[in-house]
Design a protein with these regions (language model features):
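Alpha-helical context
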Residues: 8, 15, 64, 68-71, ...
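The feature captures the catalytic groove of carbohydrate-active enzymes
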Residues: 1-7, 40-117
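Active-site core of glycosidic bond-cleaving carbohydrate-active enzymes
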Residues: 29-33, 37, 79-86, 90-97, ...
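Conserved helix-loop functional segments at active or binding sites
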Residues: 14-17, 41, 45, 101, ...
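Alpha-helix N-cap/helix-initiation motif
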Residues: 1, 21, 25, 77-81, ...
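Hydrophobic or amphipathic alpha-helical targeting/insertion segments
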Residues: 5, 11-42
Length: 206
C-alpha cells in the first residue's frame, strides 16, 4: 500500500505542527529522507522511456508510484491508485517543508525538485486518464477510471490539492457523490452497502 510512505512524512509533520518540537522533528528527519528515497525508487519504475513515449493510455502511468492494493479497494488486483499518489504528493510537500524548518537547504532543494516533477506528472496523468476513459470526474485509479469519491476526497483533505485539481471535474466528482448520497437517504434507489469510509467526505464538503 504505497500511501504509507507519504502518510509517515505527513504524520511527522503533523506532530510538529501541534508541538513545535524541533528536536523531535530533527530526530525523525532521517526517516523522512528514507521515505522520500523509497518514493523516488517507486517513481523511477514508472519513469522509463516506455511510459514516457507511449500512447495516451501508457503515458497516463508516467512518473507515478507503482501499483498497489492501495486503500484495500484493489486487493483483487493492484492498481495505480490516485489515493497512493495524492498521499505521495502530500508526503513530498511536507518533506520539503520539514527541510526548510530544519534549515537543511541542500535536502530542501533536492526534495523540492522531486516534489515539483511529481506534481507535474501527477496532473498530466489525471488528464490523460480522464481523456482515455472519457470521464468527467476524478478517477480512483489509472487502469479503471473508476468513480471513488471516498478515495478522491483525500486530495482535498488532508492533501490540500484543491487549487491544482482539474475543474470542473473535481466539482463533478463531489456533485455525483452527493446525488448518490441523497438518493439513498431519500429511498430513491435500492442499495445495500454503506461504508464508514464515506465519513472522509465530510471534510471536503466543509
Amino acid at each position: 500500500e504505497h500511501d504509507s510512505h507519504g502518510e509517515l512524512i505527513y504524520l511527522i509533520r503533523e506532530y510538529f505542527n501541534f508541538t513545535k518540537d524541533t528536536t523531535f522533528l530533527r530526530s525523525k528527519n532521517k526517516n523522512v529522507i528514507k521515505a522520500v528515497e523509497y518514493i523516488e525508487s517507486l517513481i523511477a519504475e514508472r519513469s522509463t522511456d516506455h511510459f514516457r513515449n507511449g500512447n495516451d493510455s501508457v503515458r497516463a502511468y508516467y512518473g507515478l508510484v507503482t501499483e498497489s492494493i492501495s486503500h484495500e479497494g484493489y486487493s483483487a488486483k493492484p492498481m495505480h491508485s490516485y489515493w497512493d499518489n495524492f498521499f505521495t504528493m502530500k508526503g513530498l510537500k511536507d518533506a520539503a517543508e520539514i527541510q526548510k524548518i530544519l534549515g537543511e537547504e541542500e535536502s530542501y532543494q533536492k526534495i523540492k525538485k522531486v516534489r515539483d516533477t511529481f506534481k507535474e506528472n501527477l496532473y498530466n496523468s489525471l488528464k490523460l486518464a480522464m481523456k482515455v476513459r472519457d470521464i468527467d470526474y476524478i478517477p480512483g485509479s489509472v487502469e479503471l477510471g473508476d468513480f471513488d469519491a471516498t478515495s478522491t476526497t483525500i486530495a482535498l483533505t488532508p492533501c490540500n490539492e484543491f487549487n491544482n485539481l482539474p475543474k470542473p471535474e473535481v466539482y463533478n466528482t463531489f456533485d455525483k457523490y452527493f446525488e448518490f448520497f441523497t438518493n439513498r437517504r431519500d429511498d430513491k434507489i435500492e442499495w445495500i452497502n454503506y461504508t464508514p469510509y464515506e465519513n472522509r467526505l465530510i471534510g471536503s464538503y466543509i
